[in-house]
């Protein structure tokens, strides 16, 4: 019995967006994997949250746990999005005329290093501030970060259309609003579950409600602003959108929520 195409796309997203082992007995498909990126984000964020809880329970200092969790997130994604962040920062610094050339350069420039440093420091500060609320915040940030490229693909042309080895297939095979269905299912589930948690007085419903409201803004604004500045999007700017939205979401949650 052949697996449905959506399941093969999910298996493809699992391989493409993470370093996790492939699913046995299922041939992955890669044409429409972007729609499942938010689901993969929840898995990766869940693993980060799990590590946080295990180490905190083992009486590790919060500062050490924070560094390990951020390192785990970078490793689980294969550095894919961080590489895109650095390349995009270098491209923006070079100006629109030399943007793609700078982004294609295998050498990382000063702007790329600066962007990476700022993002990591902001994530560290945010997680330290969130404290016990960090595990839920990691899940929320990972989800919204992977939603950001969906808006970029819907709104902007691909800058390297036709070039081999690029992420242009994300736009080529997309089917309009259907690409947002998996993410919408997660939001619908969250909106259904949160009220029941509030009834039983679960304290962390504040994080869920704030995350649903806070994360949506950067998920749209970051890819929108990047697309306008670059004149379109590429695989690098998709990755940059993921990292920037994750970081901004964590920062906003840290600012708006009481210390955990």
UniProtKB/Swiss-Prot annotation:
Source domain of life: Bacteria
A Gene Ontology BP annotation from the UniProt entry: cobalamin biosynthetic process
GO terms, molecular function: adenosylcobinamide-GDP ribazoletransferase activity; cobalamin 5'-phosphate synthase activity
UniProt cofactor(s): Mg(2+)
Localization terms from the record: Cell inner membrane
Principal EC category: transferase
TM segment ranges: 3-23, 36-56, 60-80, 108-128, 133-153, 180-200, 206-226, 239-259
Pfam assignment, any one: CobS
EC number: 2.7.8.26
Keywords: Cell inner membrane, Cell membrane, Cobalamin biosynthesis, Magnesium, Membrane, Transferase, Transmembrane, Transmembrane helix
Bilayer disposition of the protein: Multi-pass membrane protein
Catalytic activity: alpha-ribazole + adenosylcob(III)inamide-GDP = adenosylcob(III)alamin + GMP + H(+); alpha-ribazole 5'-phosphate + adenosylcob(III)inamide-GDP = adenosylcob(III)alamin 5'-phosphate + GMP + H(+)
A cellular component annotation (GO) from this entry: plasma membrane
Metabolic or biological pathway, per its Swiss-Prot or TrEMBL entry: Cofactor biosynthesis; adenosylcobalamin biosynthesis; adenosylcobalamin from cob(II)yrinate a,c-diamide: step 7/7
Family the entry assigns: Belongs to the CobS family.
NCBIfam families in the record: cobS (TIGR00317)
Known role: Joins adenosylcobinamide-GDP and alpha-ribazole to generate adenosylcobalamin (Ado-cobalamin). Also synthesizes adenosylcobalamin 5'-phosphate from adenosylcobinamide-GDP and alpha-ribazole 5'-phosphate.
Record HAMAP family: CobS
Name the UniProt record assigns to this protein: Adenosylcobinamide-GDP ribazoletransferase
Organism expressing this protein natively: Prochlorococcus marinus (strain MIT 9313)
Lineage of the organism: Bacteria, Bacillati, Cyanobacteriota, Cyanophyceae, Synechococcales
The encoding gene: cobS
């Amino acid at each position: 019995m052949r697996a449905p195409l959506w399941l093969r796309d999910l298996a493809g997203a699992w391989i493409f967006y993470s370093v996790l082992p492939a699913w046995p007995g299922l041939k992955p498909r890669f044409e429409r994997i972007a729609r499942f990126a938010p689901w993969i984000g929840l898995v990766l964020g869940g693993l980060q949250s799990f590590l946080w809880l295990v180490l905190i329970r083992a009486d590790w200092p919060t500062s050490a746990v924070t560094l390990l969790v951020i390192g785990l997130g970078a490793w689980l994604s294969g550095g894919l999005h961080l590489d895109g962040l650095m390349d995009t920062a270098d491209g923006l610094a070079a100006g629109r005329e030399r943007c793609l050339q700078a982004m294609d350069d295998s050498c990382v420039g000063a702007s790329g290093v600066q962007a990476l440093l700022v993002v990591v420091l902001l994530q560290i500060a945010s997680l330290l501030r969130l404290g016990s609320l960090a595990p839920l915040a990691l899940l929320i940030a990972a989800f919204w970060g992977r939603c950001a490229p969906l808006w970029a693909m819907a709104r902007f042309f691909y800058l390297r259309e036709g070039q081999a080895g690029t992420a242009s297939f994300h736009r080529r095979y997309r089917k309009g609003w259907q690409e947002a269905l998996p993410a919408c299912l997660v939001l619908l589930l969250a909106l259904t579950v949160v009220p029941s948690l509030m009834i039983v007085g679960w304290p962390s419903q504040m994080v869920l409600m704030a995350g649903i409201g806070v994360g949506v803004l950067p998920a749209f604004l970051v890819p929108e602003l990047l697309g306008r500045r670059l004149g379109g999007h590429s695989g690098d700017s998709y990755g940059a959108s993921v990292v920037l939205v994750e970081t901004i979401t964590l920062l906003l949650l840290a600012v708006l929520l009481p210390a955990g």
